[in-house]
Amino acid sequence: MPALLNPVLNLLMLRGTVTSVERFTARMRRLRIEGDALAGLDVLPGQQVRVLVGSALTRRTYSVWRYEPSGALELCVLDHDGNGPGARWAREAAVGDEVRLGKPEGSFTLRPDAAHHVFVGDETASVAFGAMLAALPDGSRVSGCVETGTADDRLPLAHAGRLDWVLRGTVPLPEAVGRLAPAPGGIAYVAGEARTVQAVRHVLRDAGWDRRSVLTKPFWAPGKRGLE
């Protein structure tokens, strides 16, 4: 990394150290990052951080799985078998590595006052869903459909027993949502592959959901590096 960029990065980005790496699902690793600069941040459930993964200009975005105000956050990073800088960083990050990352950001966040909460997405969405679900009290009304490649790809989500788990290749996610038929009046959080997100949004709109009550986040699309 060019030395001239370091002062700029110190102003724009936070610094932390990887303190734990754990295989969390068949294709996800959980990274714990700690540092004084991470203490006391304003973090909303569902937000994300941009991480430097190679050169000073190469960043990838990851949802925050868990945040501790004392100065620690956890990311769950998916190994998608690619060979780009983000995929390599996700596979190779190790305890002791320094990490530079931006402050948590994004508007795809929990609406805690909603009458009920509907979660629809795939593995890439389930990390943000995990933070949102963990922030909901036990009595919250929760439903949804989460798609994974195998049962071993399922994250340990709070309220998981109230979700319909869909194996990829069995029932298309939009069809699963149609079968679930969540009643309008709450908030729907829809994230994952871009075309699927759009299709699910149409299913909900056709079922009477107000567009303002359907929060969407296309995390990826085939053949594209990212949609941030």
Residue ranges and their predicted role:
Residues C145-E228:
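Reductase modules of NAD(P)H-dependent flavoproteins
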Residues D36, T61, S107, R195-V197, ...:
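Hydrophobic N-terminal alpha-helices or hydrophobic patches in metabolic proteins across all domains
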Residues G35, V53, V77-D79, K103-E105, ...:
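Short, structured patches in soluble enzyme cores that scaffold and shape functional sites
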Residues V8-E92:
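Ferredoxin-reductase
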Residues M1-P7:
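Short boundary/loop segments of OB/S1/cold-shock single-stranded nucleic-acid-binding domains
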